[in-house]
């Protein structure tokens, strides 16, 4: 038995296939979803999603959203999503370093919040690339 996974961003369907297991970053930590999981609605944090398909792990950077699990259907609505295979590793590393520097230099509440969000997004993209290279 498999999970039917559908990941949707405002402008496109990012993923639509079956998988054996999913690991998501929620607001309260990571959660694993297997077939026959109890019904669940959860908020998603900026982070990575790992997907097991035919014995192979792949990953994706998610930029926050919601996940609904019901009757082996997993529907994920996200603000943005990017498959690790679509992310340039060098660009992800450079963006992460720049975001880290901007966060360290941020002053004032608004600038710190914006720099922290940029840092989290850059880290999610880099983590997705790194997870795919380790797991793939």
Swiss-Prot record:
Claim: Cytoplasm is one of the keywords in the record: no
GO cellular component: chloroplast thylakoid membrane; proton-transporting ATP synthase complex
GO MF entries: ATP binding; proton-transporting ATP synthase activity, rotational mechanism
Topological category with respect to the lipid bilayer: Peripheral membrane protein
Location in or out of the cell: Plastid, Chloroplast thylakoid membrane
UniProt keyword list: ATP synthesis, CF(1), Chloroplast, Hydrogen ion transport, Ion transport, Membrane, Plastid, Thylakoid, Transport
Keyword Coiled coil found: no
Cystine connections: none
SUPFAM superfamilies cross-referenced by the UniProt entry: Epsilon subunit of F1F0-ATP synthase N-terminal domain (SSF51344)
Pfam family, one: ATP-synt_DE_N
NCBIfam families (UniProt xref): ATP_synt_epsi
Family: Belongs to the ATPase epsilon chain family.
Quaternary assembly: F-type ATPases have 2 components, CF(1) - the catalytic core - and CF(0) - the membrane proton channel. CF(1) has five subunits: alpha(3), beta(3), gamma(1), delta(1), epsilon(1). CF(0) has three main subunits: a, b and c.
Described purpose of this protein according to its UniProt entry: Produces ATP from ADP in the presence of a proton gradient across the membrane.
Protein name as catalogued: ATP synthase epsilon chain, chloroplastic
Organism phylogeny: Eukaryota, Viridiplantae, Streptophyta, Coleochaetophyceae, Coleochaetales
Gene: atpE
């Amino acid at each position: 038995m498999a999970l039917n996974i559908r990941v949707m961003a405002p402008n496109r369907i990012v993923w639509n296939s079956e998988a054996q297991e999913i690991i998501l970053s929620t607001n309260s930590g990571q959660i694993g979803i297997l077939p026959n999981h109890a019904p669940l609605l959860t908020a998603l944090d900026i982070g990575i999603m790992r997907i097991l398909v035919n014995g192979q792990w792949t990953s994706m950077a998610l930029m926050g959203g919601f996940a609904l699990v019901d009757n082996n259907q997993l529907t994920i609505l996200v603000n943005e999503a990017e498959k690790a295979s679509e992310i340039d590793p060098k660009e992800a590393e450079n963006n992460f370093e720049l975001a880290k520097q901007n966060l360290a230099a941020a002053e004032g509440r608004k600038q710190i919040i914006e720099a922290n969000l940029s840092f989290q997004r850059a880290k999610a993209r880099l983590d997705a690339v790194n997870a795919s290279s380790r797991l793939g």
